[in-house]
């Protein structure tokens, strides 16, 4: 137990909470421009060609973000919206691209979990 005198000499310090998404600077999403769109391979037990892109954000940060879903229309100089959320098997990828926002189109022929991939509801007649 700390005494009052000890508290007078040195007050209690608050715990520093480290953010997992520093480039967003306390915003839910940030806009950026694609610098490079490429594929990369995941860590050991998994095998695939994951679609990622290097994005320069409006606040000057440059981050690698993951392009979710099957197929995409992104290329260099595309304007994209990124959100937080890491990809467990890709080291250094801590952001996701929001599908269906700005220049990034939604996933074609998507019927389930549409909101995650920027797809509008189909009108049945």
Curated annotation (Swiss-Prot):
Keywords: Methylation, Ribonucleoprotein, Ribosomal protein, RNA-binding, rRNA-binding, tRNA-binding
Function description: With S4 and S5 plays an important role in translational accuracy. Interacts with and stabilizes bases of the 16S rRNA that are involved in tRNA selection in the A site and with the mRNA backbone. Located at the interface of the 30S and 50S subunits, it traverses the body of the 30S subunit contacting proteins on the other side and probably holding the rRNA structure together. The combined cluster of proteins S8, S12 and S17 appears to hold together the shoulder and platform of the 30S subunit.
InterPro entries: NA-bd_OB-fold, Ribosomal_uS12, Ribosomal_uS12_bac
GO cellular component, one term: small ribosomal subunit
PROSITE patterns: RIBOSOMAL_S12
Gene3D superfamilies the UniProt entry points to: Nucleic acid-binding proteins (2.40.50.140)
Modified positions (3-methylthioaspartic acid) in chain numbering: 89
One biological process term in Gene Ontology: translation
Full protein name: Small ribosomal subunit protein uS12
Disulfide bonds: none
Any one GO molecular-function label of the UniProt entry: tRNA binding
Protein source organism: Wigglesworthia glossinidia brevipalpis
Entry superkingdom: Bacteria
HAMAP family hit by this protein: Ribosomal_uS12_B
Key word Protease present: no
Complex and partners: Part of the 30S ribosomal subunit. Contacts proteins S8 and S17. May interact with IF1 in the 30S initiation complex.
Family statement drawn from the similarity comment of this UniProt entry: Belongs to the universal ribosomal protein uS12 family.
